[in-house]
Structure formats: C-alpha cells, structure tokens
Regions:
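Active-site-adjacent segment of FAD-dependent monooxygenases/related oxidoreductases
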Residues: 111, 115
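N-terminal secretory/targeting leader peptides
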Residues: 10-109, 119, 127-329
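Bacterial N-terminal signal peptides
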Residues: 1-5
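Alpha-helical scaffold segments in soluble metabolic enzymes
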Residues: 122
Length: 329
C-alpha cells in the first residue's frame, strides 16, 4: 500500500526562514480507510506546524506513482516520498523483506518492539546507504487474511484458487506457497476482476474489507490466516531529504510517527466492532490449521525470496523471543 510526494523547492541552500516546499502525496488506500485518514491528518498538522512552509496535497487511490514504481523514483533521487510495504525497499536491502515475512507476528506490539531494536536500526542504516531515508516504519493497518467465497482451513483448500495480490515478490511467493495461485493486480482493478471471475478472492485486513466494501463482491468468507501483518513505511530520497531544513525534517518525522502510533491505538480498539459490522453484512470467519500453513511458508526464508536468508529469519526470531519473554512477565 503506497504514497508519492512531489517536492518543489529551490536547488540552492535555503534557511528555514525562506524555504517553502509543496508535497504531492498519493496512496492506494480508499478515503474511508484509516490509513488514508491518518495521512490526511499528517498533512494538515505538518502544514500548520511549519506555518505553511511545508504543504502536502493528498491524492488517494493511487492517482500517481505507487508500489515498486514509487520506491524506484525515491532511489533515483526523484522528489517523491513513497509510503509502502517494507518489502518494496527489500528489493534494495533484503532484510526488510524478511522483516515483514509470512507468519512472524502474533500481535501489533511484537512488530512495534522489533523495529526499535539495534538489529532493525542497523538495517535502517544499510538502506540509507542505498539512498533511501526511512521516515517511519510504524504504520500498521491490520493483519492480512484470506477473503474468498468458501471456508479455507488448510493449504489443500487453496488448490486452484486464484487470489489477487499486490505485485511484491514477497506477496506472490507467499500466496503460492500457501497453496493458492497468486495473481498480481493493481488495487484499482481488483473489484472488476472479482466480479468477472478473473480471480476467486483476495487477501487483506478486516478494515480494508469493511472500508472498501469488499463483501459486496460476494466474497463473504474470511479465513484468519494472519499470514502478513499489514504495514507501511514512509520513504524519501536521502538527497531530497538533505535539502529540507532540519527544523522541518524534525516536524515531518514526528508527525508521521505520532499519527502512525495513534492509528495503531485506534485499530486495536476498533477491530472487534469491525468484525461485528462485517458479520452483519453476512461475512463469516473461520480459524485455520496454522501449523500446516507455517510448514509451507517457512521455506521462503531459505532462498525462495531474493536475498533473504535463514540467518535473517533466525535473527528476527531471536529478538521476538526476547520481546515475548518480556511481555509474559
């Protein structure tokens, strides 16, 4: 899920007194979804706190560059900010693909604690050396589950089932490993593809299901696979970032971080009600044979994903064990 921000600024060195910048922000989320609303609040507060020096214009629904295209523009030094799943920067530093790999997290807090560790901070430095400044990794929009028209309990239930997925290699390989036939499509084409039978289902969070009315396509069964924790990072070119005065850089980072944390709190409080609202629309939920799916996806960490290694997986698991031990006290 992604954003692009075009930055217009003078090329010469400027002080915060005479610096102005206009940011065009695009993301694939529907205006009714929490992340879209959160981004809108960030834009408003940055404008207010910089007294108009940093102005952000938001464009929902992927009206400008998204996904891999947006991240590529950042890497090339274009005046964009990409808000996207960390696996897209995993194309440059594979550890970020491992960070959001399948079947890792039991809850939001585990991920939030992991990204604060020295392990992940070291990865942040590595990706900065590639020209990508990470402004935030904190955006979470819920666990991603399978949405189909029949119950899915085991990998065998997915044989021959075509599932829409984003174009990320991580998503494609994970859905295939789980037993489905991954079918990458832009989000804007998903509903027509479902209605025309091009795909049999998709994967996403309950918040996306309700906010975009996925259930109206007739796909009214949700399997609680929790195969991915839905996350987004915020990325900008290191060269572009260097042009912005420190005073404004601090505000930008603080506002993205603050609003992401607020969004997580809201999601935790809303999930149970969202499930009830979906059930009122006829959506049914079922548990899965999780060990059976984990057995299928664990091999992705051993050479199935470009650059991802078992060592990365083991490093993540070591940190998660520490985090879970602290939480259990």
């Amino acid at each position: 899920m992604s954003s692009a921000i075009f930055i217009s600024a003078c090329q010469k060195e400027q002080t915060s007194d005479d610096f102005t910048i206009t940011l065009r922000l695009s993301h694939v989320f529907n205006v009714n979804e929490e992340l879209a609303q959160s981004i809108e609040l960030v834009a408003q507060r940055i404008n207010e706190k910089t007294k108009g020096a940093v102005r952000i214009l938001t464009y929902p629904g992927g009206q400008i560059a998204t996904y891999k295209d947006g991240v590529e523009m950042v890497v090339r030094g274009a005046h964009f900010i990409s808000v996207e799943d960390p696996s897209y920067i995993g194309d440059y530093v594979p550890e970020f693909t491992a960070l959001v790999g399948p079947m890792l997290y039991n809850n939001f807090d585990e991920y939030m604690e992991l990204i604060k560790t020295p392990l992940v901070k070291g990865w942040l430095k590595k990706v900065e050396d590639k020209g990508i400044k990470v402004l935030s990794l904190q955006y979470i929009f819920g666990f991603r589950n399978l949405i189909t028209d029949k119950p899915v309990n085991t990998p065998d239930d997915l044989r021959g089932v075509k599932l829409r997925t984003p174009g990320s290699k991580l998503f494609i390989k994970t859905l295939n490993a789980m037993g489905a036939t991954a079918t990458p499509l832009p989000w804007g084409e998903t509903f027509s593809a479902l209605q025309q039978g091009v795909v049999d289902g998709l994967e996403g969070s309950e918040f996306t299901n309700l906010g975009t009315k996925v259930y109206e396509t007739g796909k009214k069964n949700v399997a609680f696979t929790k195969h991915f924790l839905g996350t987004c990072g915020v990325y900008i070119s290191t060269d572009v970032w260097a042009k912005i005065p420190q005073q404004y850089r601090t505000i930008i980072e603080q506002e993205f971080t603050y609003e992401a944390e607020q969004m997580i709190m809201q999601l935790k409080g809303k999930h149970a009600q969202v499930v009830k609202d979906l059930e009122a629309e006829g959506v049914k939920f079922n548990a899965i044979d999780r060990p059976a799916f984990e057995k299928r996806t664990i091999n992705l960490y051993d050479g199935e994903l470009p650059g991802v290694t078992v060592e990365m997986y083991d490093q993540i698991q070591t940190e998660l064990k520490k985090i879970r031990a602290r939480a259990a006290k």
